[in-house]
Amino acid sequence: MLTKRIIPCLDIKEGRVVKGTNFLELRDAGDPVELSKIYNEQGADELVFLDITASFEKRDIIIDVVKRTAEQVFIPLTVGGGIKTVEDFRRILRAGADKISINTSAVKNPELIKEASEIFGTQCVVVAIDVKRNYINDSNDKNLSGKYIFESKNGKFWFEVYIYGGREGTGIDAINWAKKVENLGAGEILLTSMDADGTKDGYDITLTKAISESVKLPVIASGGCGSSAHVVEVFKNGNADAALMASILHYRETDVQKIKKEVQKNNIPVRI
């Protein structure tokens, strides 16, 4: 088993870190550079910065936040939000990012994945996939053709890809999309369950496992982390390569080192 990664996620709005529930009700969680330094000291393997308003409000990313962080933190930094062109990739990589995460722009223009991976290398291209369970009312629905159907106690459903910060459904099946981005040259998938986001009830194991098993790419599980036990579960049962978390770290409910020790106790390899 490859070494698993623990990755704090910093959702950034107007230069501050914020956190919400199910992509809504945002509250302030601190300064991105200061938080990055803390997580670096705690032993985080990487950091993810998501400018959560950039795609929707068509705003450029706060390049200076990336620059200031990259000057003080020396673990890999992934940056996403509002990135639409190869030139956007170039600017943010130049500012000090190691990888670029694209979501809305990848759905709107899948060729961007191919283009960016050819220019900067697949290791630089992370495709973020925001997913919501879409429950089926009529099993004869003609739009279900080619979609992967799952069952839960609440009924049958499929996993739908959302864009614009979770504001717009696409009608695209998440498993089909994951396979497509792999073929186009993505180096990694950042997979967020919108249903689990901010709930602290645990990752969506069904979703994570389904995506992890359908591609050879590393999958970062995101959405719902409320404890070290949830991280252990997503590694053991969801086959995730990395676990992303926000609230439990930002509000000091635990720290990276404690999570890693718990993971290690369960015979899962991590960098201590």
From Swiss-Prot:
One cellular component (GO) term of this entry: cytoplasm
Top-rank EC class of the record's enzyme: lyase
Pathway per the UniProt entry: Amino-acid biosynthesis; L-histidine biosynthesis; L-histidine from 5-phospho-alpha-D-ribose 1-diphosphate: step 5/9
GO biological process: L-histidine biosynthetic process
Primary location group: cytoplasm
Pfam families reported in the protein's UniProt record: His_biosynth
Reaction equations catalysed: 5-[(5-phospho-1-deoxy-D-ribulos-1-ylimino)methylamino]-1-(5-phospho-beta-D-ribosyl)imidazole-4-carboxamide + L-glutamine = D-erythro-1-(imidazol-4-yl)glycerol 3-phosphate + 5-amino-1-(5-phospho-beta-D-ribosyl)imidazole-4-carboxamide + L-glutamate + H(+)
Key words, A-Z: Amino-acid biosynthesis, Cytoplasm, Histidine biosynthesis, Lyase
InterPro entries in the record: Aldolase_TIM (IPR013785), His_biosynth (IPR006062), HisF (IPR004651), IGPS_HisA/HisF (IPR050064), RibuloseP-bd_barrel (IPR011060)
GO molecular function: imidazoleglycerol-phosphate synthase activity; lyase activity
EC number from the UniProt entry: 4.3.2.10
Compartments reported by the entry: Cytoplasm
Active site as annotated: 11, 130
CDD domains: HisF
Subunit relationships: Heterodimer of HisH and HisF.
Function description: IGPS catalyzes the conversion of PRFAR and glutamine to IGP, AICAR and glutamate. The HisF subunit catalyzes the cyclization activity that produces IGP and AICAR from PRFAR using the ammonia provided by the HisH subunit.
HAMAP family per UniProt: HisF
Family membership: Belongs to the HisA/HisF family.
Name assigned to this protein: Imidazole glycerol phosphate synthase subunit HisF
Source organism phylogeny: Archaea, Methanobacteriati, Methanobacteriota, Methanomada group, Methanococci
